[in-house]
């Protein structure tokens, strides 16, 4: 019977690496510490009843390599042997996975823990700087990722080690500040009476914001797809869409600035995920950095902190692979999150 194990010993190769999001799951296999990961096609979570089926059909049936262990990054808190995902119907059951998929060792981490691991050593070719602040200090960092939800992860640098800090920062309160905000926010769809950052700063949140703007302006909303809203906004072909993406960038800047202060992220704030890349033209405009820096009495501090958009197509897998190769470089907690045969 597989048992929880708090060992910090390296996981045995070959290692299955998985980034399990609300909509898509991405997998690779790392055969040894020096090899490049073997990538597999993305898997839509809605296409499989369980994660075990997705791994079997999407990975194991397509390779002769049998992984001995797995590191999985999941969207949701990890509290026990059954790990439900926040934005999809899968439940990760490491004990069942070990018995059913022939593995010896499974480690489960938060998805933005994996994103945080990635930004420890992200090259310039895999990131785009937003704003004038520069520098690449060996100092704490933070990652925010608007996608199916809003993920937040910290990366603290201490004792010559990178320590990822998972959490549910996407669910902090987000409130109105400007006159326009006070017009719009009463029409934002709430969750149990509150507006969290994730109610606006994700795909469905973008639609939520667009619909609220339409209500305030007495316009009939014509779009229900986040991609339609962003494309019309960037083309300048729909006034409500343009304002939606502009305010999205502003609110993202506010939350990013808050997280920069929480983690004292002098090493930079990184925006990951597909939405950040798609709205890059909007993030390059002044609104994002102005909101990021508008943190009196600490405006001067925020002006020194660089902000980046992560452009690496598989950043979470890259971060997990870095940890799998050199676990001693990272302070990853395994307590309550690692199971061995």
From Swiss-Prot:
Q: According to its record, what are the GO cellular component terms?
A: cytosol
Where does the record say this protein resides?
Answer: Cytoplasm
Which reactions is this enzyme annotated as catalysing?
D-glucose + ATP = D-glucose 6-phosphate + ADP + H(+)
One biological process term from GO is: glycolytic process
Record-linked InterPro entries = ATPase_NBD (IPR043129), Bacterial_glucokinase (IPR050201), Glucokinase (IPR003836)
Report any Pfam family annotated for this entry. Answer: Glucokinase
Q: Does the keyword Cell membrane apply?
A: no
Where does it primarily localize? cytoplasm
What keywords sit in the KW lines?
Answer: ATP-binding, Cytoplasm, Glycolysis, Kinase, Nucleotide-binding, Transferase
A single GO molecular function, which one? glucokinase activity
Q: What is its EC number?
A: 2.7.1.2
Q: Which residues bind ATP?
A: 18-23
Q: Which family, according to the similarity comment? A: Belongs to the bacterial glucokinase family.
PANTHER family associated with the record: GLUCOKINASE (PTHR47690:SF1)
Q: Which NCBIfam families does this one have?
A: glk (TIGR00749), PRK00292.1-4 (NF001417)
Q: What is this protein called?
A: Glucokinase
Q: Which species does this protein come from? A: Rhizobium leguminosarum bv. trifolii (strain WSM2304)
Its lineage opens with:
Bacteria, Pseudomonadati, Pseudomonadota, Alphaproteobacteria, Hyphomicrobiales
